[in-house]
Amino acid sequence: MSLIKPFRALRPAPGRAAEVLSPPYDVLSSAEAREHVKGKPWSFLHISKPEIDLDPAINPHDTAVYAKAAENLKRMVAEGVMVRDAQPCYYIYRLTWRGRSQTGLACVASLADYAKNRIRKHELTTPVKEDDRVRQIEAVNAQTGPVMNSYANAPEIDALLVQAAGGKPDVDVTADDGVRHQLWVVADPALIDKLSRAFNALPAIYIADGHHRSAAAARVATARKGEGSHSFFLSVIFPEREMTILDYNRVLKDLNGRTPDQLLAELVKSFTVTPSAEPVHPASAHEYGMYLAGRWYKLAIRPGLVPGDPMGRLPITVLTRKVIEPLFGIKDPRTDKRIDFIGGARGPDGLAARVDSGEMAVAFALYPTQMGDLMAVADADRIMPPKSTWFEPKLADGMVNHVLD
C-alpha cells in the first residue's frame, strides 16, 4: 500500500477562503472561539467547535454538539461556500510567518503504515481527546483537521514542491495572527505521479502535531473495517529543515515546601546558577532560565549529568529528572494540577507575569526541542514527555478536508 495518495479535497470555493479558514480547534477555548467568530458566519470554527452555536452552558462533548457540526458543514456545502474537487489532487500548502516559509504536501497518508510505525509518533494521547475527534469524524463523515507531519532530508522532494508551487496560488490568505496561508492545487497527472513516487520511497515520516487526530482516524478505520477512504488520514508533510519548534515552558504553583533560598541550594547540586539582570533566553539545549521571587537566573547543567540517549538528552527530560520530579514531587505532568505549560510565543514576560501575579511560584524557560531530536526519539520508538514541542505557525482548519466516501 502507498504511504500517501492524492484525494478529492472539500475546500473553500474560489474567493471564499478568507471567510472560512480558522485557527485549529485545539488552540482556542469555547469562549475564545465564540468571540473569534463574531461577524464570521462561515468560519470553520462553526464545524470544528460547534458548541459556539449552542447554549454556552452545554457540555462540549454533548451529542447535540456533534450533530451541529454536521448541520453546519452541510449548510456550507449547500450554500456553495465549500466545494469538493472533481478528481484526486495533491495540494501544496505554504505557511509564511515572521519572514520564514515552510512548504509541504497536503495529501492523505496510510493508516496501515501508521500502524506499522512507518508513520512515527512521539507523543501519548488521552482518551477524552481521542474520543472527541472520533465523534467529530463520524458526525461529519470527514477528517477536518490536517495532521502536521515531517520528512527527513530529501532534496528530490524539496525540488518537486518548489516546482509544484511555481505559479499563482489558488488560495492566498493572511490570517488575523499574521500567518500567510497559500495553496496550490496539483491536478497534473505527471506531477502527481512524480510526487507519489518520491514520497512513497521515504522510509518514514514523522508526526509533528496532531497525534489525537491521527489516533482518532485510526480508530474510525478500525471500526469501519475493510479498505476505503477511511484507511487514510488527512496530512500535510513538510521538510524537517523548514519546521519551527518554539520553546514550551513550565510554571509551578508552589515550591513543594521550600523557600526560594532552599530551592536554590538544591539546584546548585546539579546546575551552575547565575543571577541575571535580564530575562534568560536559553542559548543551548542544557541551559535554562528560571524566574523565582522576582528575579531571573540562568541554570546550566553540570558536566557529566546529561545522558547520551535520544530521550535522556532532551532539555525537558533533563529538567524533569533533575528538577520537576525530585524537587517538586511531580510524577505525571499530564494530571498534576501544580504544573502548567506556556508556549514560547508568549515570551519570558509571559512566564514572569504568571509568577508575579501570585498564581505561580516559579517558572522555567527551556531551549526548544529540535526536529532532529524529535525524529531520533520517534526512531527509537520512545515517547517524549508531555508538552515537549510547540510548533508555529500552525495549519488552518478548513483549508482542505478529507471526505470519507
Each model region followed by its residue ranges:
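Surface-exposed, charge/polar-rich loops and edge strands
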Residues: 1-405
